[in-house]
Amino acid sequence: MPVARLIAAELSPFSERWEKVMGQPMSWRLSFLWRARKTPRVRERLAFRVLRVSSTLVVTAASIGMLGWGAVMEARSAFLQSTLLSRWAGTMTFELAPGPSPNARFPEDGPYDQRLGYAQLPNFVGALNERGYAIERQAVSSPTLAWFLGHGFYGPYPQKDQAGLTLYDRAGAVLHQASYPAAIYHGFDEIPPLVVNTLLFIEDRHLLDESDVHRDPAVEWQRFVLAVGQRLAATIDPRLRGGGASTLATQIEKFRHSPRGRTDAIGEKSRQMVSAALLAYLDGPDTLEARKRIVVTYLNATTLASRSGFGEIIGIGDALAAWFGTDLAEANRILKSLPDTPATLARQGQIYREVLSLLLAERRPAYYLRPDRGPLEALTDRYLDWLAEARVIDASVRDAAHAVRLPVLQEAPKAPNVCCAAKKATDALRTELLDALDVASFYNLDRLDLTGFSTIDLPTETRVSEILSRLNEPDFVEAHHLVGYHLLHTIRNLK
């Protein structure tokens, strides 16, 4: 066979050189090839084997090439995963059904789940059962959702950006309502484009790419591959350890549901990515609207340390008020406007610097938002220059923001005082809830995602509170005949 002769001819010089240099014959395999020249039948078998191996190698190389090409195209278009994940997410449903749920799953460690009370639900239910309460209705998960939650992933359903304790009277009127965070964005259109573009420049520049309608917001492939390479390199040299591959979607999962709001292992990062991807494809393969919601949720949910008298600070809106005394509505109005005077430009530069500094402080809030603002000021100045170079902001905004420093509030703004008489009934209800649910404080109780209905009549309670608040007015007391035996003994010194 021509192929066998060709192989033998090619190996002959090599075999001679091998024996000359090494002082011993080649391995039996090569010797076999050499001897195959003399045996026609073996020569034919060898040729057939060579052809078969060559064909296998060609097919394997072609398959690898096709797989590589397919992987690149899928990374660019996300067509396949958007189809599969949206169908999978569509099977993860739940519905309210009478009585306790047979497959209830509760979160355990996430800061969001702890704050809103979801992680404590088993304890709450047990405590209320001991007081004679019973579950009237509870959500029953579909088999797919139950399996997904049972394997430790986070629920793919829309979650509240704002929640708190709400109490109603017998007619459905609000007695008490606590909303945390207090200042939030209710939709994408409320956010100034300047804030959106700045956030994307810092965290996830291609998130809102409208040309890629099926984009998976849970992973940015270039950063992901780079992060994997850096992680592998770090196993050889720890100094080569680079940054992560977090996107806005996975960061939301992290500071809401991951234990202590951190990513401690690769397994936790995978859990964040899968959960974020399923949530993004919940409404179908087209994720553009879901990606806009991610921007809204991130701005409302990012954690920015805490302050005495204010508590934990969640979201850009509350952070502007707590750290700088700036109202979110005013900030939105000014950042959306076109400055027409030096004063308005200066104010826009001031507010933009505050917003930018908060977006940067999210990386290490306790460090950057400490009394010494030097590191945060320096980081903000660097980003102002980079943002202007990238044409995210105008040079005029950059210069106006460079010209100011971050304000320092000695004390965080406090909630407005409420008359004790007006709070008497609601405080009694809240105290009863503290005892029934075994919650530590009003602070924790008011941050639960909890709604309660009472037998109190609000008009009557309001009238009683009004009368009690005026008992220090002599004319009011005398006009209502409240002076006398077993009443007020005198109208003097009522105050």
Where are these regions (language model features)?
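Active/ligand-binding-proximal structured segments within catalytic/core domains
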Residues: 190-231
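Export/targeting segments at the very N-terminus of extracytoplasmic proteins
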Residues: 174-207, 271-286
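A short, well-structured edge-of-sheet supersecondary motif
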Residues: 160-176, 191, 480-495
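Non-catalytic, structured segments within soluble enzyme domains
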Residues: 56-59, 64-82, 86, 93-97, ...
